[in-house]
């Protein structure tokens, strides 16, 4: 079974092709047979297409203003040249899409119809940088691959189990009735990681209390009890919660009003600042990339040092909040770009929770662990580093969709 997975961002398109054989899914995530990534931000006048297949890596510049042509060139590499892995695009049986916001409409993976597309469009105000890109990806596949089934896998679906007292804001009740509530995000990653954690721990998921720390450019935590999300840090939009690469996370809600009322900012100005010019990037003045922040710290940059200290403070603060929701903790999980690769962030985060009996094995923490427990044998809380596999999680949903027919 050939399954194409598309993960569209505001300025990127990441894709991969899985070839699944047999009547059951493999225990461990398989490697895709082909990967294609487009970055539209590489330069002002062109994008960059990178293809990896058959041990070959190819790069190609793309016209910056023609996303359809770029996608077409990417898919052509599946059937042409050194990166050819299939004879014809018709071999692709289903296409799975990560969709950031499904609101309350969709609590599980859903075959894409005109109605589903309209809902994704209606939710653009709640996910303005992501949902338009998802729609573009869906419609591009329609143009290039015809009537192949397409499946939407929603980042919000995993958090549809949030108790109402967690999901609701302390605002007029009629606003809640109109959908102004906390939805949560990174659900595909959170769900994958807690299932993988149960496998690594050798325990049933429905017996565990877990905190999953998805720390990338976007960051969120999820408190998961018995396999169910009971709290998370992102809310109505992916802006709430932790300090992130270029996003502010939670701030005093009066600040945007103050800027608009007294300093001539437009709502669009404020949205841009909070999403793209805040977080690590805004405080440090250096970058949204933690590696650049740490390099600047070594060079004596005090603003970079402040940014890192704020990042850790807020990470600890919200881990504490998730802990309170759970009433205990079996394992603390780190995943995504920062969570998987920054031993310093893991060490600093865990340091605050020694009172739980959590003990980090320093050697394991610094050994670039993957799907590994990095706590000491006598630690009362396990600490896991898990490589998130969002693409594989989406591919599994596609497999289930086709095999359940």
Swiss-Prot record:
The record marks 186, 247 as: Transition state stabilizer. It holds the Pfam family Acetate_kinase. It catalyses: acetate + ATP = acetyl phosphate + ADP. SUPFAM superfamilies: Actin-like ATPase domain. One of its GO terms (biological process) is acetate metabolic process. Its EC number is 2.7.2.1. It is found in: Cytoplasm. It is an enzyme of class 2 (transferase). PANTHER family: ACETATE KINASE, ACETATE KINASE-RELATED. This is Acetate kinase. It comes from Gloeothece citriformis (strain PCC 7424) (Cyanothece sp. (strain PCC 7424)). The lineage of its organism: Bacteria, Bacillati, Cyanobacteriota, Cyanophyceae, Oscillatoriophycideae. The gene is ackA.
């Amino acid at each position: 079974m050939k399954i194409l997975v598309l993960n569209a961002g505001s300025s990127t398109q990441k894709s991969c092709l899985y070839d699944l054989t047999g009547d059951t899914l493999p225990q461990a995530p398989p490697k895709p047979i082909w990967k294609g990534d487009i970055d539209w931000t590489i330069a002002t006048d062109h994008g960059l297409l990178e293809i990896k297949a058959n041990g070959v890596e190819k790069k190609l510049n793309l016209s910056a203003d023609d996303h359809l042509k770029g996608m077409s060139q990417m898919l052509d590499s599946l059937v042409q040249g050194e990166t050819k892995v299939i004879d014809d695009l018709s071999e692709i049986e289903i296409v799975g899409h990560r969709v950031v916001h499904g609101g309350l409409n969709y609590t599980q993976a859903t075959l894409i119809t005109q109605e589903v597309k309209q809902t994704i469009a209606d939710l653009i105000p709640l996910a303005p940088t992501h949902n338009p890109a998802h729609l573009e990806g869906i419609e591009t596949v329609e143009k290039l691959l015809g009537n192949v089934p397409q499946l939407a896998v929603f980042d919000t679906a995993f958090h549809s189990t949030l108790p109402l007292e967690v999901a609701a804001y302390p605002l007029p009740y009629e606003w809640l009735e109109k959908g102004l509530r906390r939805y949560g995000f990174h659900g595909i990653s959170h769900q994958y990681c807690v299932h993988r954690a149960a496998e690594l721990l050798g325990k049933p998921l429905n017996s565990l209390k877990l905190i999953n720390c998805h720390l990338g450019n976007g960051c969120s935590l999820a408190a998961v009890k018995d396999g169910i999300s009971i709290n998370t840090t992102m809310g109505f939009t992916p802006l709430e919660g932790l300090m992130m690469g270029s996003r502010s996370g939670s701030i005093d809600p009066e600040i945007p009003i103050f800027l608009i009322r007294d300093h001539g900012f437009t709502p669009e100005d404020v949205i841009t600042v909070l999403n793209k010019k805040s977080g690590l990037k805004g405080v440090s003045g250096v970058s949204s990339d933690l590696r650049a922040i740490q390099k600047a710290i070594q060079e004596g940059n005090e603003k970079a040092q402040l940014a890192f200290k704020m990042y850790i403070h807020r990470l600890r603060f919200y881990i504490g909040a998730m802990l309170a929701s759970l009433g205990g903790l079996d394992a603390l999980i780190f995943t995504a770009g920062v969570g998987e690769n920054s031993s310093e962030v893991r060490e600093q985060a865990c340091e605050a929770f020694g009172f739980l009996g959590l003990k980090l094995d320093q050697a394991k923490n610094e050994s670039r662990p993957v799907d590994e427990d990095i706590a000491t044998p006598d630690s009362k809380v396990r600490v896991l580093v898990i490589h998130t596999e969002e693409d594989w999680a989406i591919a599994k949903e596609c497999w289930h969709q086709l095999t359940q027919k």
